[in-house]
Amino acid sequence: MRQFLFLLLLAGGVFASEDNFTEDLIFGDTGSNAPKNEIARNTPVSYSPFEKDAYLTSSFGENRGTRYHAGIDYSTNMEEGWPILAPEDGRVKEIRTSPFGYGKVMLYQGKSGKTWVFAHQSSFGKLDIQVRKKQYATHKNDVKLTPNTPYAKGDTLTFSGSTGIGNPHLHLEVRLDKDRVVSPCVLGALCLDTIAPQIFAGAIWQGNSIAVTSAEAIEKGCMVTPVKNEFGLYLALKIADYSREPKDNPMAIRRLEVWRYDEKIYSKVVDTLRYSKMTDVRNELLWTEEADTAGDWHYIPAKIAPLSKYTIEVEDFAGNITKRVFTLHPKCNGNKPITQVKNQTAPVYTFLGKTMLNLFMCRSGYNFKVTGDKDEVLTDDLCSAMPQKITTLGRVLQDYPTAKYIEYTASASSTGDGKAVDEKIAVFRRTPYQTNVNWKADLGNGTTITQKITGIPVAKLDSTPIAMAVTRTHTDSLDFFEFHPKGLQLKKWNVCVENKNNMAALYWLGETSRDWFIFDKQTKGKNRCASANELRDVALILNEEPMSLGFPYWANSYIEGISQPVLKIPVVYKYDGIANGNAITAKAKNKWIAVEYDSEPRELVLEGTKVPDAGEEITIIIMDEAKHKNKFVITVPEI
């Protein structure tokens, strides 16, 4: 249900790069001299989707975890039913309905040859009649049509909504062909954005030594380096853009350029993307545990040298520019700590694509012991052997190359949640050139985890030990297993969790939603195995809470472009949701009724004219993602 050169970093591994790296797309190089305060790049507005202004809430190329955002999103002020106008003369190439992803989506083929995509619609206007006809002919809720209906520029095409994923908004996408998409802003689409991009932080590293600098210090012209007067440094910048106040929706940037004195050493302009290269997002935007907080960490694949002055220039899609000038120093005045984790309780996590170990927790009463591959104790007090601060796990393996486990313990008063902890982190030392891994780890309490990983990206420059880790984390509702470093786009990750005391199904954790999803394909029994193309947190979950339906109620929704009565029924579940719209069947007196499933906020929607009279019954059968069939009988309320 979810979906990179590959990710440039492992814990201590960096890919080779050119000294001068330029990746300019449509607009190309904006000049070889050091940046001025402004540049002339204001594409005249030639198309506004609505009959009124609307601000951006998501920009082109934004980080979507395992892919880039292929279009732009407009706010509709949490309202549905805004008429959307045709950008040019053309025909409706295709319309589709689905409870997920794009929801109700229209593909409009313009005379220019471009395909304009309008997603999350509430209504296709007059084309709703064709949709309804196909649904009732096939008894399927999710359908696809190719109407080929002509429209002229400025005609009302469709109506905004909230189908698929997200609150009410319009997703606009422009496809040049089957592989390439272009930013609508480049084509003259309205892109209202009144705030220049923000640089929240920077990071400089060499091998397993990392230094992070806050925005306050960077604004004063200083960036902290972890090593003094040494070459072979690497740089990442945490950046976000906002379109307006309040700053609710962090967005991506269009252009990022870096100069060393007056030499441009890096340039990235994002005006086009390729579907075939969408996973390159892991290449440019480094994975961190706080991946859903404001800003992305942009990796700069250019060698950073000491004793040099650097200029950074960042531009958004409306032409607003932010510039910073800095030099490298061992310390910076005004530097503040940077948040590296979110929703994280275990001492091991991923930051900038590296596996990190939080030895700062020693100060709270945690104890760490390192054991070797022959179960020998390498140190029973890592808190005394190493500085009590956050470090890369690779740095620990540098001192203890035969380490196999790091055991950590803490009393109930030390953990902060009133529960004592006694767990261990299984660690694996991988060479920078090792592309495949077979690794078996015993995490105690009868749990063994086996991983077979193929197609790991190869680090070409850095020979520092590369650290991988897995540990168990306890929460109030369940225990799950964390795998690090995240953000690796692999050929295949096969993971098996063996626990004779828990033979429940295997689930994976959504990166930003924090929801659990069952693996579609997995083995059964005490050894549960599943596959993915990147590391995920997983859990063995026995779902004993069946899906239920809330009280039905009448509301209004847009049908054929007009607000009309609909019956809405809340859907309640903890783990196993609805796989697709066709997993739902509704009947009244044995007569099939079309159902729309709104995945946010989890409601079934039935057209009012198709619902029987008040007091009569509707039978609804839902197949959930775990293949459980749920049957409900509801009574139609008074309108």
Regions from the language model: what does each represent?
Residues 16-116, 144-147, 152-153, 162-170, ...:
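Surface-exposed, glycine-biased beta-strand/turn segments
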Residues 152, 192, 207-333, 376, ...:
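Long, low-complexity serine/threonine/glycine- and acidic-rich segments characteristic of extracellular
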Residues 158, 176, 241, 314-318, ...:
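Surface-exposed loop/turn motifs at beta-strand-loop junctions within extracellular Ig-like
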Residues 182-230, 240, 326-356, 541-562:
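Short, compositionally biased P/S/T/A/G/V-rich stretches that sit at domain boundaries
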Residues 227-229, 245-252, 356-369, 486-489, ...:
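A short beta-turn/strand-edge loop motif at beta-sheet boundaries
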Residues 236-242, 356-362, 494-498, 566-574:
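Short edge beta-strand/loop segments characteristic of extracellular beta-sandwich folds
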Residues 430-441, 463-511, 554-556:
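Proteolytic processing hotspots in large secreted/extracellular or virion-associated proteins
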Residues 485-535, 580-592:
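Proteolytic-maturation and junctional protease-sensitive modules
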